[in-house]
Amino acid sequence: MYVNHETALDDYPFKTQPYEHQRVALNKGAHREAYGYLMEMGTGKSKTLLDNIGILYLSGHVNFAVLFAPKGVYRNWVSKEIPEHFSDSIPHRTIRWVSSPNATQLKEIRSVAQPFEGMTFFVMNIEALSTVKGVEALTWLGKKFGAKGLIGVDESTTIKNMKAKRTKNLIKAGQLFAYRRILTGSPVTKAPLDIYAQAEFLGPRLLGHSSYYSFQGRYAVTQKRKMGAHSFEQVVGYRNLEELSGIISQFSYRVLKKDCLDLPEKVYTVREVELTPEQTKMYNEIRGEGLTLLDGGELVSTQSIIAQMLRLQQVLSGHLKTDDGDLVTFPTNRIEELVSICEEAGGKVIIWSRFRHDIQQITQRLKQEFGEDSAASYYGDTSDDERLRIVQDFQKPDHPLRFFVGNAATAGYGITLTEANTVVYFANSFDLEHRIQSEDRAHRLGQKNKVLYIDLISPGTIDERIVKALRQKIDLGAKVLGEEAREWLRLDPKRMK
């Protein structure tokens, strides 16, 4: 049964009512075989895709969807997006891919082969498509369910490289599915050539070119460079971008926060970050020590409890200061998730962390990724003259300084940073006043856009309680006492594995 666009939206049992721009997106793309939701971060791409899937299910077109996202955040679809936004009126199940599953996880993965009267979601990390096992799984899913299936890629700039193994594998397997979707907030004009591979995943020659080199020749300005005995064409600029945008608009919908009139002035969201094995091990050791001290009556003051929480929070950021003052570091996914956010953000970004080591590492990584002049740090070590220069440069719309990396205790008061409409909390302060004041650096007189606030959270850790408390305007210094501290320390990251 085919349901036309208007009937689908009028009759669809939304779990959460869509904003007007989401209705426009669904009207344009819900029934297209290949479509892109190129919606700026904070405008609700995930909900739009889930409503799209529900509409196709009720139309009789799909009963299976495989969704891809980067490894650090793909579980967010399982724990947050699908439960919060997919219609309760549609029976559904969600199965998560794990590359090295235990017995319980393997049983869950294999359950996909069992008949199910309803909608099945199969969630995978995009990195799995660089492995034989992941490609074989997707190919099997496509052959079995693809005729009434949808394949979607969240943060689709992860497949921008046509030479990458994962991109080639996804394009090939994607054609087994009746419907294909991409989700990204990255503006096409920032890196126009990145759209080619994403469009090829949606369908061959959607951009009107049979090869990447033909596409590059039309839209890029190149110069021949020599490196030793080798010569190559280096991209030095772009052309015909208005034409390219017009072509892309035929199979996608683009919207910016500033154009979403019914969005609230402040939009809050979280990005989940998976702990590395090293972080999980150290986190559990420290929380075990804390519970032992609590049970023995040794943790009696607010200050000693907060000190224990602080050690846990350091581990979540990928480092720990020992009792001797030495700094120990751990592998972490948090900085790479931040880089993904910064890639997707259209304009300038404020990044807050309470830790000096974070600020230094973040600034260094962003400079490495986006250029030496792209990031600046504002914390205790920053001189007064440098602080003034950083704020002035950041507030200039055309200045290359895009990322303000600061400590809320130092930079959260008095300064104006309204050129940014994206604010990321890498590691929150426990101080409620620091949170309130740091939010207001972007949201104050002079801000012309909606402001998106993103908290990085590792599931099953104190991150969850910290963010919940701060958003409820609870000052943590007076809150985490007695049984409250015990409950925080009982949180187990392993429960999310």
Predicted regions and their residues:
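Conserved Helicase C-terminal RecA-like lobe
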Residues: 1-2, 30-31, 42-70, 129, ...
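Conserved pre-motif I regulatory segment
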Residues: 2-38
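Conserved P-loop NTPase motor "coupling/switch" region that bridges the ATPase
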Residues: 63-64, 79, 84-85, 89-95, ...
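Conserved motor-coupling elements within RecA-like helicase/translocase cores
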Residues: 104-122, 385-402
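Conserved helix/coil segment N-terminal to the catalytic DExD/H
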Residues: 104-120, 127-147
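SF2 helicase motor core recognition
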Residues: 130-134, 190-192, 359-363, 388, ...
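Walker B catalytic acidic pair
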Residues: 154-155
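A conserved SF2-helicase RecA2
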Residues: 430-497
